Amino acid sequence: MLPMITGFMNYGQQTLRAARYIGQGFMITLSHTNRLPVTIQYPYEKLITSERFRGRIHFEFDKCIACEVCVRVCPIDLPVVDWKLETNIRKKRLLNYSIDFGICIFCGNCVEYCPTNCLSMTEEYEFSTYDRHELNYNQIALGRLPMSVIDDYTVRTILNSPQTKNGVNPLI
């Protein structure tokens, strides 16, 4: 008789514990009902990136002095810098500069250590392609500035969404 009573007591304790856990989960669910959704419809809505976002690298050919600091600080020796020594003026002349974004880890060391600030990070992050060789950008492709998300009229940004117009600013 005694084992049967202790079995019923254990069953009752386990039932109360399960009800408490279900109640805790339900309270968390109820606390989330007043929050606005964070999800965006990606191709049609885009988040505005932060100032420190590390996207595609922008390169200014005229500022580069071919010092190769970017290659030395890169953890994977990624930037390819081709130059020629001009003997009459004793300076390097940059011939070609390229970065393969299929390999780049976007650490930002090249931008940080560049002495002439010819490299900068942009807010562009869409690199989708069917051929990985198209991710190898030369100095011409690196020199193009991306279209800003704010200026893109085809995309409804978070700033124009109805939630932010009502005075609620969920993400910024």
UniProtKB/Swiss-Prot annotation:
GO molecular function: 4 iron, 4 sulfur cluster binding; iron ion binding; NADH dehydrogenase (ubiquinone) activity; quinone binding
Residues holding [4Fe-4S] cluster 2: C74, C104, C107, C110
Domain 4Fe-4S ferredoxin-type intervals: 55-84, 95-124
Alphabetized UniProt keyword annotations: 4Fe-4S, Chloroplast, Iron, Iron-sulfur, Membrane, Metal-binding, NAD, NADP, Plastid, Plastoquinone, Quinone, Repeat, Thylakoid, Translocase
Cofactor(s) the protein needs: [4Fe-4S] cluster
HAMAP family according to UniProt: NDH1_NuoI
Name by which UniProt lists this protein: NAD(P)H-quinone oxidoreductase subunit I, chloroplastic
Species of the source: Capsella bursa-pastoris (Shepherd's purse)
Lineage: Eukaryota, Viridiplantae, Streptophyta, Embryophyta, Tracheophyta
